[in-house]
Amino acid sequence: MSAEPLPAEEDRSAYAGVLRFYELAKHQEWAVRDVPWGELPPVPEGKGSPHRQARRIDVWRSVVMQQLQADVLACEMAAQLLNAAPDPEARLYYSTMVQDESRHTEAWLKLIGRLGGEGERDPHLDALGHMFLEADTLEEKVFLMQVFFERLIIPRFRLIARSSRGTVLEDLCNRLAIDDGIHHGAGMAYERVLLEHAPQRVKNTLIDAANRMLPEFAAHALWRPKAREMIGHLMEARDRERLKTELNHGVRLAKSLGLDVSDVQLPF
């Protein structure tokens, strides 16, 4: 009796990019205990009267609160992607992303605990979270979360790090800029695979999703809690210019995926 021939191995070379980001994520893994908690001040230390110092702490606490809020939502989104992805290479990657977002949340919780606890929530960030979680297709979830949001948020980490030299906050922002760069790169790699044979109607839904997301992201980027209202007014023109540059870059990324971006409506 002759042995049954083994089935030909499926060609998985299209997923090589996703696997590369899985390996990179494993290489870059860090632990919350690695953060220099006892060696550096949590945030820049203010000078002047106790009242002035307390106001300065409130400003930094509001910055940390926004990042904590974003990463709590990101935990849900990453878990949803892990559950939704059918491909083993993507599931391997998303298993690391779930760990990353949980680690980020733990670190932000520790940091904000040293600044007096949680503060005012950003309503636009909550709206973005609902938009991501309620997206209908895997293509849309990856597009909104990793292709757009993760990429658009990286410059903010770099900006916060530059403004908080020699602190735990700077250390965390530098770590998260690297992690989110990997999340974004993996999302680009996986979205290319997902869109390679996707029908035009799926691609059209991504443009519709971008048009829903971009105004909300702009509102989120420009929103300031009460603790930062005055600073926000002083820096609004610069913030708008920076945001415009970032959104244009996001549109170029969408175009690089083979999407027709002519119908994307920028909020500026």
Residue ranges and their predicted role:
Residues P155-R156, R165-A227:
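Secondary-shell segments that build the walls of catalytic and ion/ligand-binding clefts
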Residues M65-L68, V72, S95-V98, S102, ...:
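Short amphipathic alpha-helical segments with heptad-repeat character
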Residues K110-H184, N211:
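Active-site-proximal alpha-helical scaffolds that flank and shape metal-associated catalytic sites
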Residues D87, Y93-G116:
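Carboxylate/His-rich catalytic cores and anion/metal-binding grooves
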Residues V43, A70-M77, H104, F149-R156, ...:
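Amphipathic, well-ordered alpha-helical segments in soluble domains
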Residues M1-R91, R114-R121, D136, E140, ...:
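Terminal targeting/low-complexity segments that flank the catalytic cores of oxidoreductases
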Residues A78-L82, S95, R158-A161, N174, ...:
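Amphipathic alpha-helical segments within well-ordered protein domains
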